[in-house]
Regions:
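Acidic, turn-prone loop/beta-hairpin segments
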Residues: 2-36, 64-156, 160-184, 203-221, ...
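Short helix-adjacent coil turns
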Residues: 39-46
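Short metal-coordination and nucleic-acid-contact micro-motifs, chiefly zinc-binding Cys/His arrays
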Residues: 227-230, 247
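Short cysteine-rich clusters marking metal-coordination/redox-active sites
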Residues: 231, 251-254
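Cys/His-rich metal-chelating microdomains
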Residues: 237-240, 257
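Short linker/helix segments within small regulatory modules
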Residues: 240-249
Length: 260
């Protein structure tokens, strides 16, 4: 994920991060708080569980899954924003695990691209301080709602998969029927980012009732097979496949990236 990334030249400013990047850094801040609380009382089991839950739930099951398309299929600011976020997380995480996984953490540190002032040995680094990436309660509440919506979409996609309507989730086009509050919440995220959040090819927002009822008040979800053809590079379905003569099996976005 960090292949070719140089933190000295490639890091982007905070205002260039996507909201999900800010969410990931806020989750890191919570980890820093919990790990420090464990270390302060020599409760290493608490540190272990905090690190484990962060890596499995916040990162592997969510953030890394959602950002795959941005990392592998695009160039530019979006990709660098994800890499900037992952680099900050990896540096902080390595410092957190150093007291209890000293050899593993040093092996990671040896491979990390360094910035000026970083020590040769991770055990000489100060622990990351809480508050640097903290998010306010409104932001956390917003993303708790977005994740709840995502969970409801996943249920409908599983049903569509069972009914042989789709195979992989990227074969799906999802319509979200919303009341005003849910519509405003979802519409605050760019549609391409919302589709990435759901890991589908297309998302449409509709005010009103429809689709399958969900546990999120004011939300109905419907899934269908996405129109268009499958891009061989990003696996998303698009009507722009073949629009670039030199790359007849790629969507317009991927063709432009390959040509760049």
């Amino acid at each position: 994920n960090l292949d070719g990334f140089d933190p000295n030249t490639d890091c982007v400013a905070d205002d260039q991060l996507q909201e999900i990047d800010r969410w990931a850094l806020a989750a890191l801040d919570d980890l820093i708080v919990n790990a420090k609380a464990g270390y302060d009382v020599y409760d290493f089991n608490k540190v272990y569980h905090a690190v484990y839950n962060f890596c499995v739930v916040a990162m592997s099951n969510f953030y890394l899954d959602v950002t795959k398309d941005r990392l592998y299929c695009t160039n530019g600011v979006g990709r660098k924003a994800a890499q900037t976020t992952m680099y900050k997380i990896l540096v902080a995480l390595d410092k957190i695990i150093a007291p209890i996984l000293c050899f593993t953490s040093q092996e990671i540190w040896d491979f990390l691209p360094k910035t000026e002032g970083m020590n040769k040995y991770v055990v000489f680094e100060a622990m990351p301080k809480a508050g640097q990436y903290a998010a306010d309660d409104a932001f956390k509440a917003k993303w708790a709602q977005l994740i709840a919506v995502r969970d409801e979409v996943k249920k409908v996609l599983e049903q569509a998969r069972a009914e042989k309507i789709i195979g992989a989730s990227l074969e799906a086009s999802v319509t979200l029927y919303c009341n005003d509050a849910v519509y405003d919440l979802l519409n605050s995220i760019p549609m391409d980012e919302l589709a990435d959040l759901m890991i589908v090819s297309h998302v449409e927002l509709v005010k009103g009732e429809g689709g399958s009822a969900s546990a999120v008040e004011g939300l109905g979800v419907a899934a269908a097979h996405a129109t268009g053809e499958k891009c061989e590079r990003c696996w998303k379905y698009s009507s722009s496949i073949g629009s670039h003569a030199a790359h007849p099996t790629l969507c317009a976005r991927c063709a432009s990236v390959v040509e760049a």
